């Protein structure tokens, strides 16, 4: 009987000093590293990169952590706020991308029936399922390669998955508080069921969504568990003992199924789920919760702040930037002096990576302001720090 008042008063006590807790610089660092690794991986395709740093699991865990913190407020208000921040950058991408597809011949006959095309087009507005795109487009010679729409649409599965995690978060949080072990385990159990063929579903859209949920759902819930203090209540030796075992089981499974270039963790949902869960669990366990940057990282505060302020823009546009950069770089093969004397430079991914980030910077300037508008902040072309937050009435 003595615990009831404590549980009802705790949120009020936590919110009393400040309606908006300060930023955790450790989480900012993880998010920036995750974005950089995503760009590098999509450029190079190096299979070992997701093992070094499981970016998608980290990004979902950080988002789940923020969602759990926000759910101290009414759920409907929180969900509306999250969608308001998420969707406008997607709409801007859609305006540019869908317009380009239509200009190159994409239209209502693409799905076999005009009704399906128009229906699926609404997923560019609210991505309950993957937004459609045109296949086999010719591109723009010398600027952007063929089938560019597939590259532009490649990152959109993350937006769709994020949307569903946000919508399900109030239920997931209630389940986590009531049955933490069962709730954390459920996505991985679902991944096992899919992998072993115990659960099969017709079509492509629903199985795709459930596969993504089973792959990264445990990471989202881990972030919520961290915010709720569930992980901190465990004996200190539990996580360092259990997390590496879970991750190594995922690695073992990947190696047993011909892990390598072209067949990495992205092609193995169960291995991805286990490796990401174990690694993210360790990263959250060692979380130092920096309110200020350590001296050795202070010089990187500006770039990290930029990456965090424009995370959605960078993620949405990076694939297209990679395709444009690769197309432009290929022009250098037309210079015999370069081909004969520095073929290693032309084959190296590092100059292309620099060009990719220059193009990403251009996208930040051209499209990043939409993230500020979506957050009801004053638009900024090039964020150098944290924006001013409007006081809630």
Protein language model regions, located:
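Alpha-helical transmembrane segments and their immediate juxtamembrane cytosolic regions
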Residues: 2-393
């Amino acid at each position: 009987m003595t615990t009831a008042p404590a549980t009802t008063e705790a949120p009020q006590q936590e919110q009393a000093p400040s309606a908006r807790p300060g930023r955790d610089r450790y989480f900012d660092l993880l998010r920036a590293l995750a974005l950089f690794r995503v760009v590098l991986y999509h450029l190079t395709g190096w299979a070992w990169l997701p093992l070094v740093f499981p970016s998608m699991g980290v990004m979902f865990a950080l988002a789940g952590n923020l969602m759990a913190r926000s759910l101290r407020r009414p759920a409907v208000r929180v969900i509306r706020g999250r969608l308001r921040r998420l969707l406008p950058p997607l709409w801007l991408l859609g305006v540019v991308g869908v317009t380009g597809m239509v200009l190159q011949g994409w239209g209502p006959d693409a799905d076999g029936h005009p009704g399906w095309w128009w229906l699926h087009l609404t997923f560019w507005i609210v991505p309950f399922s993957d937004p459609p795109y045109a296949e086999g487009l010719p591109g723009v010679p010398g600027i952007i390669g063929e089938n560019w729409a597939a590259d532009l649409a490649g990152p959109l599965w993350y937006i769709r998955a994020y949307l569903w995690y946000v919508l399900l978060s109030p239920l997931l949080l209630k389940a986590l508080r009531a049955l933490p072990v069962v709730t954390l385990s459920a996505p991985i159990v679902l991944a096992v069921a899919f992998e072993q063929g115990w659960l099969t579903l017709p079509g492509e859209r629903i199985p795709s969504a459930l596969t993504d949920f089973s792959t990264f759902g445990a990471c989202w819930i881990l972030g919520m568990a961290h915010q709720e203090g569930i992980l901190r209540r465990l004996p200190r030796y539990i996580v360092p003992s259990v997390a590496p075992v879970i991750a190594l089981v995922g690695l073992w499974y990947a190696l047993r199924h011909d892990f390598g270039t072209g067949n990495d963790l992205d092609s193995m949902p169960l291995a991805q789920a286990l490796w990401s869960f174990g690694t993210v669990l360790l990263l959250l366990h060692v979380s130092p919760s920096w309110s200020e940057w350590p001296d050795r990282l202070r010089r990187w505060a500006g770039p990290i702040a930029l990456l965090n302020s424009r995370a959605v823009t960078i993620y949405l546009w990076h694939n297209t930037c990679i395709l444009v950069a690769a197309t432009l770089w290929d022009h250098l093969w037309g210079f015999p002096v370069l081909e004969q004397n520095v073929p290693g430079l032309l084959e190296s991914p590092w100059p292309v990576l620099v060009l990719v980030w220059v193009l990403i910077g251009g996208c930040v300037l051209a499209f990043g302001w939409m993230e500020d508008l979506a957050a009801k902040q004053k638009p900024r072309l090039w964020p150098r720090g944290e924006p001013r937050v409007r006081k809630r009435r």
